[in-house]
Design a protein with these regions (language model features):
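Canonical P-loop GTPase G-domain recognition
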Residues: 117, 126-184, 188
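P-loop NTP-binding site
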Residues: 188-298
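Conserved G1/Walker A P-loop phosphate-binding module
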Residues: 1-89, 94
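Catalytic P-loop NTPase motifs of RecA-like helicase/translocase cores
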Residues: 42, 65-67, 99-100, 128-129, ...
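Active-site glycine-centered loops adjacent to acidic/histidine catalytic or metal-binding residues
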Residues: 61, 123, 153
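Conserved glycine(s) of the Walker
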Residues: 19, 159, 251
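Conserved, well-folded catalytic cores of nucleic-acid-processing
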Residues: 30, 49-53, 68, 83, ...
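Conserved C-terminal guanine-recognition region of P-loop GTPase G domains, centered on the G4
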Residues: 50-56, 75-149, 203, 220-223
Length: 298
């Protein structure tokens, strides 16, 4: 007899920069959430949808849980904690190449309270000697009775299929919540903003990334079938604006070039990308600015 179709919501949690977005992109087999080596890249809770013949798994990609330093940080933590409500399972990600720290313990204590099966996913196994992985497993396994332990490399795909296989075992029969071809709940404008923000994170220095907000002001299809997109990058200081623009506009041109290529792949159309940089002092601590940029409480 054919097994019933299964579905469920799975929170992906961990401290900043353990590879949550990279893992989800690998599972979905398409880039849905932005990836950067800067911590706390993901700012909103994002639904990412995996559908196959047997199940539909809705992953909740969350901001890395951390001690907030401003209103934006508190919003990010709230988004991460809210993902732990009404879920069917959780993936607790840790990094194989880093020692267990207070941040990992803080996240684990939060996810334990959700009362659902929790899988320990040890990411970045490509960065360590394979002989060291059993010790990492033993270190975390003493802390909690995990539903399963899965060492993976989200970067190169090692063991990633095991994640979905293990989730299928514990999910209950349920409906398809989303169409087969839907992979995220994020609108195109937000995806465009996130692509630009990702390229900016990669192109700028350490002092800029977390002071940046990117907002897509306009998306209009022109007569020549080219999509005109106007994006505004907000920073907090004039010095940051100069860094983003670069000498003779070189940095901004680089950001625009790489972002345009990816946006054209997303939209399937030629794109004219118009990026502006503006200063909005201390926007991360201003509720009105956070709401304007889409960081709103649910």
């Amino acid at each position: 007899m054919k097994e019933q179709f299964k579905s469920g919501f799975v929170a992906v949690v961990g401290r900043p920069n353990v590879g949550k977005s990279t893992l989800i992109n690998r599972i979905i087999r398409q880039k849905v959430t932005i990836v950067s080596d800067k911590a706390q890249t993901t700012r909103n809770k994002i639904l990412c949808i995996h559908t196959d013949d047997e199940c539909q798994i809705i992953f909740l990609d969350t901001p890395g849980i951390h001690k907030p330093k401003h209103k934006l940080g508190r919003f990010m933590d709230d988004a991460a904690f809210s993902a732990l409500h009404d879920i069917d399972a959780a993936l607790f990600l840790v990094a194989a190449d880093e020692k267990r720290g207070p941040g990992d313990m803080f996240v684990l204590n939060k996810v334990k309270d959700a009362g659902v099966p929790v899988f320990l996913v040890i990411n970045k196994t490509d960065k360590v000697d394979k002989k060291k992985i059993p010790a990492v497993i033993a270190d975390y396994s003493q802390l909690y009775d995990f539903a399963g332990v899965i060492p993976v490399s989200a970067l190169n795909g090692d063991n990633v299929d095991i994640v979905t296989d293990e989730l299928k075992k514990i999910l209950q029969p349920g409906p398809k919540y989303f169409p087969d071809d839907m992979i995220t709940d994020q609108p195109e404008r937000l995806l465009v903003s996130e692509i630009v923000r990702e390229k900016l994170l990669r192109a700028t220095r350490e002092e800029v990334p977390h002071a940046v907000a990117v907002f897509t002001e306009e998306m209009t299809k022109r007569d020549n079938d080219k999509v005109y997109i106007r994006v505004t990058v907000y920073v907090e200081r004039e010095s940051q604006k100069r860094i983003v623009i670069g000498k003779d506009g070189a940095v901004l041109k680089e950001i625009g070039r790489y972002a345009r290529t990816e946006i054209e792949q997303l939209l399937g159309s030629n794109v004219f990308l118009d990026i502006w940089v503006k200063v909005k002092p201390d926007w991360r601590n201003k509720t009105a600015a956070l709401n304007e940029f889409g960081y709103k409480d649910e």
